[in-house]
Design a protein with these regions (language model features):
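Membrane-embedded alpha-helical bundles that constitute the cytochrome b-like, heme-associated redox core
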Residues: 1-154
Length: 154
């Protein structure tokens, strides 16, 4: 009986240097702009004529949205070059599935945050969105650490 495998599945799913740099820059930018938006939204509010807001809050959200578009593109790149080949090797499978699930939730919840009209629902989705988003670097680092601890062929 033969198993079905993707072409080149035995080669592993290592991400090349330039795409890896793109993943790191986009991921760091996305996380940093989201964290800065949270900081300015919740902790650095100033009383203004529109209520308690910080003038930079909207800019951090705009930058976060721009990085989110880049992240969607980057995820598409990784899907074909890393996720699918990695699926066949079964290496770091759990952390990889968790990362894909987290990214999927972040994309879905971002869509909901943009289009949900009910403020109570938006608040719940917002808290879940930034909770998952803030934890993503830990999961990413765990996935990377396992890659270094168990290089291909060992």
């Amino acid at each position: 009986m033969t198993s079905r495998r993707a072409p080149g599945a035995n080669a592993g799913a290592r991400v090349a240097t330039v795409p890896r740099l793109v993943v790191h820059v986009v991921g760091a930018g996305l996380w940093l702009t989201g964290a800065l938006w949270l900081l300015f939204h919740y902790l650095l509010k100033r009383q203004g004529w529109l209520g308690a807001v910080h003038p930079l809050e909207s800019w951090w959200l705009r930058f976060h949205g721009a990085f989110a578009f880049a992240a969607i593109w980057t995820f598409g790149l990784l899907w074909g070059t890393h996720v699918v080949p990695g699926w066949w090797t079964r290496r770091r499978f759990r952390s990889g599935i968790a990362l894909v699930a987290f990214v999927g939730w972040l994309m879905l919840s971002a869509y909901l945050l943009y289009y949900l009209g009910d403020e109570d629902q938006r608040f719940v989705v917002s808290v879940l969105h930034w909770s998952v988003g803030l934890s993503c670097p830990l999961l990413f680092l765990a996935h990377r650490w396992r890659a270094r601890a168990h290089p291909p062929g060992h």
